[in-house]
Curated annotation (Swiss-Prot):
It comes from Pelagibacter ubique (strain HTCC1062). It holds the Pfam family Ribosomal_S19. The lineage of its organism: Bacteria, Pseudomonadati, Pseudomonadota, Alphaproteobacteria, Candidatus Pelagibacterales. GO terms for molecular function: rRNA binding; structural constituent of ribosome. Belongs to the universal ribosomal protein uS19 family. This is Small ribosomal subunit protein uS19. Protein S19 forms a complex with S13 that binds strongly to the 16S ribosomal RNA.
Length: 97
């Protein structure tokens, strides 16, 4: 079920404070976050984040197209190695009579 409109998007309070603090700082270091569930709001545009995927931090810079999505959508947690090609698969078992 979708979140109620009257509640507004969920954004971790500490994340908002860090973004406001970074906008005043001239160094522009990426913000390290574990909050994959936070929604990207327009104030985040142009800010760099390091989003934790369960193993390492993935660098992401927020653009206009990302507004409204969750931070976790841009930090995949699983590695896809592809499907096994047909020639590498074993031969099917022969039926016994």
């Amino acid at each position: 079920m979708a979140r109620s409109v009257w509640k507004g998007p969920f954004v971790e309070e500490s994340l908002i404070k860090k973004v406001e603090k970074q906008k005043l700082d001239p160094k522009k270091m990426p913000i390290k976050t574990w909050s994959r569930k936070s929604t990207i709001i327009p104030e985040f545009i142009g800010v760099s984040f390091l989003i934790y995927n369960g193993k390492k931090f993935i660098p992401v810079t927020i653009s206009e197209d990302m507004v409204g999505h969750k931070l976790g959508e841009f930090s995949p947690t699983r590695t896809f190695f592809g499907h096994t090609p047909a020639e590498k698969k074993g031969k099917p078992a022969e039926k016994k009579k």
